């Protein structure tokens, strides 16, 4: 199946693996975000890939160009299917992200996040600037 759905695994390691066991890698891909990757590290990618899944590593990298370059290379070295960066990091960071994938036979897809969405999508307009957060 070419257009597989992407299932977010916003869970802890054990529950993520238990959910993955109920899914078919032929019909879906899995998203590993900040919560799961921070708590489980690269092992979660290894475990899910061993089950046959393609992984979208959703960490929205955003830092100085060299740091993002290295982070994107590390993601590619893990063998993820797709990785993202936050586009607000600027053109140099975006170009570094693209360069990081040069030389890979099958590099992950690289996508840019332009705006974060949430149920309250206008929170960035109401941030308190006159007091400590």
Sequence positions of predicted segments:
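Conserved N-terminal beta1-alpha1 strand-loop-helix module at the mouth
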Residues: 1-57, 61-91, 125
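Short, acidic Gly/Pro/Ser/Thr-rich loop/turn segments
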Residues: 14, 118-120
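A short helix->loop->beta-strand "cap" motif at the edges of active sites that frequently abuts
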Residues: 53, 106-108
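Short, well-ordered secondary-structure micro-motifs
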Residues: 68, 95-96, 121-122
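Non-cysteine beta-strand/loop elements that form the S-adenosyl-L-methionine
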Residues: 109-116
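Conserved small/polar residues in nucleotide/adenosyl-binding loops
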Residues: 123-129
